Amino acid sequence: MMEWDNQLQPNNHHSSNLQGIDVNGGSGAGGGMYVKVMTDEQYETLRKQIAIYGTICERLVEMHKTLTAQQDLAGGRMGGLYADPMMSSLGHKMTARQRWTPTPVQLQILERIFDQGTGTPSKQKIKDITEELSQHGQIAEQNVYNWFQNRRARSKRKQHGGGSSGNNNGESEVETEVEALNEKRVVRPESLLGLPDGNSNNNGLGTTTATTTAPRPEDLCFQSPEISSDLHLLDVLSNPRDEHLVGKMGLAESYNLYDHVEDYGMSG
């Protein structure tokens, strides 16, 4: 009996060792596999990484909110669309649409430059003038350009002998985009329209204005007899609002408005 007990004890001890191997990731006598995906240390490292990533995401969200709030505040001060410094030049063009009155100092400088007889300054010269005048008040490049256009047209009207004696060099002018467009129509060379008679008259006040009569198709295209069958397409030019388009069309006498009419199937 004693010998039998001694034989059972080694067997039991061996069996317990196998169970320990099974639990710790080994293979038991039954052939089952027990595998751990990661150790406790690896699991703890992964948990810390996830926590760090979560903190980073929260900080990124806070930074985005802060930057958005700053941009909104800057946009409110700068006019919304022009908060970007790259858009500052467009901002000058937009402010040119507003009514502008030169200060006495600005007007004196403008008159002095105009009296030098250089005509309408170049783009770079206008930029330099604007920079100089900005020291004496608010002004944009478009304001300077419009002022020289209007001043030149007014000087031409005076040369025609119909100018009012009350209009002196010190009078104040208000520049608008509509005024600039009107002046462009007045100074438009009528000879470019291809009209032999000029179609200009004097209203008795010294102001030479262009008539609202639409140019005749046969006068506009007299150099292209081959397109006489397509002259009916020029009826759209009878609208007075499109007269400024006619001036652009007549800039080059050799330009044929109907070079590609047949390509688009409009020749009828």
From Swiss-Prot:
> Which residue ranges carry the DNA-binding annotation?
95-159
| InterPro entries, A to Z | HD, Homeodomain-like_sf, WOX13-like
Q: Where is the composition biased (Polar residues)?
A: 1-19
Keywords recorded for this protein, A-Z: Developmental protein, DNA-binding, Homeobox, Nucleus, Transcription, Transcription regulation
Q: What is this protein's expression induced by?
A: Induced by wounding.
- Per its UniProt record, what Gene3D superfamilies does this chain match? Homeodomain-like
Which molecular function terms from Gene Ontology are attached?
DNA-binding transcription factor activity; transcription cis-regulatory region binding
Gene deletion effect: Early flowering. Altered fruit development. Siliques with narrow replum. Reduced number of lateral roots.
Alphabetical GO biological process terms: callus formation; fruit dehiscence; fruit replum development; regulation of DNA-templated transcription
Q: Where does the protein end up?
A: Nucleus
Question: Superkingdom of this entry's organism?
Answer: Eukaryota
Tissue distribution of the protein: Expressed in lateral roots, cotyledon and root vasculatures, pericycle, stem cells of the primary root meristem, leaf primordia, flower vasculature, stigma and gynoecium. Expressed in developing carpels, floral buds and inflorescences.
Cellular component per GO? nucleus
For the region Disordered, what residue ranges are annotated?
A: 1-23, 152-179, 191-217
Q: What is its main location?
A: nucleus
What does the similarity note say?
Belongs to the WUS homeobox family.
The protein's job, in short, is: Transcription factor involved in the regulation of fruit patterning. Promotes replum development by down-regulating JAG and YAB1/FIL genes activity in medial tissues. Seems to inhibit fruit dehiscence, maybe by controlling valve margin lignification. Promotes callus formation at wound sites. Is required for the formation of highly vacuolated large cells in callus and for the establishment of organ reconnection. Targets directly genes involved in stress-induced cellular reprogramming, and cell wall modifier genes.
- Protein name as annotated: WUSCHEL-related homeobox 13
What is the organism of origin for this protein?
Answer: Arabidopsis thaliana
Q: Which gene encodes it?
A: WOX13
